[in-house]
UniProtKB/Swiss-Prot annotation:
Quaternary structure annotation from Swiss-Prot or TrEMBL: Heterododecamer (2C3:3R2) of six catalytic PyrB chains organized as two trimers (C3), and six regulatory PyrI chains organized as three dimers (R2).
Source organism superkingdom: Bacteria
Keyword field: Pyrimidine biosynthesis, Transferase
Family membership: Belongs to the aspartate/ornithine carbamoyltransferase superfamily. ATCase family.
GO MF annotations in UniProt: amino acid binding; aspartate carbamoyltransferase activity
Reactions catalysed: carbamoyl phosphate + L-aspartate = N-carbamoyl-L-aspartate + phosphate + H(+)
Gene transcribed to yield this protein: pyrB
Protein name: Aspartate carbamoyltransferase catalytic subunit
GO terms under cellular component: cytosol
Length: 316
């Protein structure tokens, strides 16, 4: 049970059977994490460096907890205080880190493709923790695990992804993963927040929220990424919530057992009604956070197996 590639850079590189392999292992780690003794030894003796060029308390903490629960020596690199702020290039940084012989490198970067570039320059396993608008593979995997545990399957479901699609690497990774697993995907939101390459995605597009949610099994809301907008994308937050914010009235168009998701952090009263976000009968938002640790444990475990096998092969 392993992955074919040395790195986890995107969902686009994973085959359906690899997705299932990773989710099956993550399922076991999710159960382990609910026990009093949560620790495993899959990463014993390995060094994990978390290097985040964008702030992300949630994702960084999730990767740190995942690594420590499996026995890794975890270091969080403070990019703001590093040589990068003094003019060092990404390649210089990669080569410097490589000389220290880390085993796992977790990277988040504001530019699409930066993590792939870094992966070409190091000998360790690299995990993409989000790069620009490109991909966020572990978020899509944790969303998939959350869906599978809630619905009992991960195929032939109707999934609505709603909101700021254009600026969302989460949306792109989820579209790729859910498509590989034979689900029907709808994108719901204003035209100004739809990606230019929408015709290539193989999805249905709705500008009307109620029509887009009609009969769906899963409602996945996205954060309005105001920091990536120059203005003009939406008239106002109040108008956006009126048309595209998820509330009980709009959710009533989905199936009665439809689940509500959000990758966080949430803008309550903008993307989603706060009461609905906290509704334990419909919302699985806290389960997403929980599954994030399990998925990252599974991903690092599988990559570590490849790393150790490769090193054993060299020694042989």
């Amino acid at each position: 049970m392993t992955l074919r590639a040395r790195h986890l850079l995107g969902i686009e590189h994973l085959a359906p059977d690899e997705i299932v392999t990773l989710l099956d292992l993550a399922d076991r780690y999710a159960d382990l994490n609910r026990r009093p003794d949560k620790h495993g030894d899959a990463l014993d003796g390995l060094t994990q460096i978390n290097m985040f060029f964008e702030n992300s308390t949630r994702t960084q903490a999730s990767f740190e907890i995942a690594g420590k629960r499996l026995g890794a020596d975890v270091m969080n690199m403070e990019v703001r205080a590093s040589s990068i702020k003094k003019g060092e290039t990404l390649i210089d940084t990669a080569m410097t880190l490589n000389a220290m012989h880390p085993d796992l490198l977790v990277v988040r970067h504001p530019h699409s493709g930066a993590v792939n570039l870094l992966a070409e320059k190091v000998n360790c396993a690299v995990l993409n923790a989000g790069d620009g608008r490109h991909e966020h593979p572990t978020q899509a995997l944790l969303d998939a695990l959350t869906i599978r545990r809630a619905k009992g399957k991960l195929h032939r479901l109707n999934v609505a992804i709603c909101g700021d699609i254009a600026h969302s690497r989460v949306a792109r990774s989820n579209i790729l993963l859910l498509g590989k697993m034979e689900n029907r995907i709808r994108l719901v939101g204003p035209r100004t927040l739809m990606p230019a390459e929408i015709a290539e995605l193989g999805v249905e597009v709705y500008e009307d929220m109620k029509a887009g949610l009609d009969g769906v099994d899963v409602v996945m809301m996205l954060r309005l990424q105001k920091e990536r907008m120059d203005g003009g994308f939406i008239p106002s937050e109040r108008e956006y919530y009126h048309r595209y914010g998820l509330d009980a009235e709009k959710l009533a168009y989905a199936k009665p057992d439809a689940i509500v998701m959000h990758p966080g952090p949430m803008n309550r009263g903008v993307e989603i009604d706060g009461t609905l976000a906290d509704d334990i009968n419909r919302s699985v938002i806290q389960e997403q956070v929980e599954m994030g640790v399990a998925v990252r444990m599974a991903a690092m475990d599988l990559l570590a197996r490849n790393l150790r096998a490769a090193r054993e092969g060299v020694r042989a």
